[in-house]
Curated annotation (Swiss-Prot):
Molecular functions per Gene Ontology: dITP diphosphatase activity; ITP diphosphatase activity; metal ion binding; nucleotide binding; XTP diphosphatase activity
Record lineage: Eukaryota, Fungi, Dikarya, Ascomycota, Pezizomycotina
Known role: Pyrophosphatase that hydrolyzes non-canonical purine nucleotides such as inosine triphosphate (ITP), deoxyinosine triphosphate (dITP) or xanthosine 5'-triphosphate (XTP) to their respective monophosphate derivatives. The enzyme does not distinguish between the deoxy- and ribose forms. Probably excludes non-canonical purines from RNA and DNA precursor pools, thus preventing their incorporation into RNA and DNA and avoiding chromosomal lesions.
Protein name: Inosine triphosphate pyrophosphatase
Family statement drawn from the similarity comment of this UniProt entry: Belongs to the HAM1 NTPase family.
Location of this chain's protein in the cell: Cytoplasm; Nucleus
Source species of the chain: Tuber melanosporum (strain Mel28) (Perigord black truffle)
Gene3D superfamilies, per the entry: 3.90.950.10
Chief location of this protein within or outside the cell: cytoplasm
Keyword Protein transport: no
Positions with a binding annotation for Mg(2+): E38
């Protein structure tokens, strides 16, 4: 099933992770950087809207991704707005958001939307990983990886290959691969 997906991202770390996860399936990923306005709403609405806009912009099939980090004590915040919270507060600020709460549990959520082209309805693939928010540990190379702990290690402390077998992104991409095999 060798195929190429046009993945709308300007995040080199995200591109590398997606490419690594899909490589064994014979799916290659080409990055396309588009500056798309982001709808405010649920991660599903945001992902669908982004996929439709991207498909219109390039006139063909696209793959887009949106990631959430949901703190259970805050009823899902920062959720789909994690990029902006991360930019403004950093790792320590995110950890401090939970200082008054005993519950440090969180969920990493990744939603991919694949759209066949202009006017088509996107298909969603969502992966979730439960963990907890901890003070930063490990290299601060990729988003909030240093503060999201899964089974005793933060994503940042994990070997990339190990992370790519359990992450929210991996789970969503597994669903995408299954769908692509069923819809060649």
């Amino acid at each position: 099933m060798p195929q190429t997906l046009f993945f709308v991202t300007s995040n080199a770390s995200k591109l590398a992770e997606v490419s690594a996860i899909l490589a064994a399936s014979g799916i290659s990923v080409q990055s396309m950087a588009l500056d798309l306005p982001e709808l405010q709403g649920s991660i599903e609405d945001i992902s669908k809207d982004k996929a439709k806009r991207a498909a219109e912009a390039i006139g063909g099939p696209v793959l887009v991704e949106d990631t959430c980090l949901c703190f259970n004590a805050l009823k899902g915040l920062p959720g789909p707005y994690i990029k902006w919270f991360m930019k403004d507060l950093g790792h320590e600020g995110l950890v401090n958001m939970l200082a008054a709460y005993e519950d440090k549990s969180a969920q990493a959520v990744c939603t991919f939307a694949h759209c066949e082209g202009p006017g088509k309805e996107p298909v969603l693939f969502q992966g979730r990983t439960d963990g907890k928010i901890v003070p930063p540990r490990g290299p601060a190379k990729f988003g909030w990886d240093p503060i999201f702990e899964y089974e005793g290690q933060t994503y940042a402390e994990m070997d990339k290959a190990a992370k790519n077998l359990i992450s929210h992104r991996f789970k969503a991409l597994e669903m995408l691969k299954e769908w692509m095999e069923a819809h060649p």
